[in-house]
Amino acid sequence: MKIAFDGKRFFNNNSGLGNYSRDLVRILATCFPENEYVLFNQSRSEKGKEILELSNVSFQETSTGNFSRQFKMGKDAQEIDADIFHGLSGELPLKWTDKPIKKIVTIHDLIFLRFPQYYSFFDRKIHFWKFRKAAKQADLIFAISEQTKRDIIQFLKVPESKIHVIYQGCHHVFKEDQSEEFLNSIKEKYNLPERFILNVGTIEERKNLLNIVKAINGEEIPLVVIGKKTSYFKRVQKYLKKNQLENQVHFLENVSMGELAAIYKLADIFVYPSFFEGFGIPVIEALFSKIPVITSNISCLPEAGGKDSVYIDPNNFEDIKAKILFLWNNESERKRRAEKGFDFVQKFNDENIANDLMQVYRNVL
């Protein structure tokens, strides 16, 4: 089987859609080496270079021309006799020849429709047009959670039979053991507290960092935050200054993937009170890192967290505070939930996800 992919996110995105693209190709190429996997893009980058070193993974430059991703990439995939074209980020090429090829698209979320206030009018219109067009063209749609599947049915009016839920995994570095020496070196490099709670993700309104900060106000609980800052950060910063919490909250930037994995392992608790997610990869990363999770009781987050994570109302910082204190002051409960969470998260291991993907690929042909 020859599978072609839209490689834009694989080569261009550092996190999010980039990680999804690289992990998907990596696990397929590793678990099913008999197939051929071809990544199309106008150019390649250093991202994912170790995956491209695999003998069954290759890069193919898209034909030149304006809007080549939209108008040339699909035809290029047909030209090399690909059996399947998989759009990894909610889009498919617009132009195809009559040559047979099956089309699959992954839709991660429809947050721009569910929470339109976070997006400009122009972005909402463009995203909606692209996603609706891809959903109509596709022979099958991968949704990364049951929540996303429900949204696709509701907003894009796609029949349920056309949608398959295939969960995401996470980078293998979060599943690897790390030496005490390395962990201590990271602790020293970033001057981390002896004990702390952790939050990972873009610092934006939807991720709800401000309610974590409000929850620890008045408590001697250090918070470490890792994520890209947006304009929302100013609101958080203003609250920190007003309440003299600057020394209690530590913001880290330019953290490598290996360092991030170490910081997860050093944390006591992972706190993720997001208002909405397509799936919630940081929850999976935390569970693989064997730390207990506190997350929202809405959206897809219970799918990612399992029954032994602790759930909160993201709108209620007093609820967040109570759940943080519950785990912070109870070592045996932290350990129990971390162990149960680690057992649960094995459903998202590479082999299970690769098998689910390949079963759908085979069925569509």
Predicted regions and their residues:
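Carbohydrate transferase catalytic cores enriched for Leloir-type hexosyltransferases
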Residues: 1-365
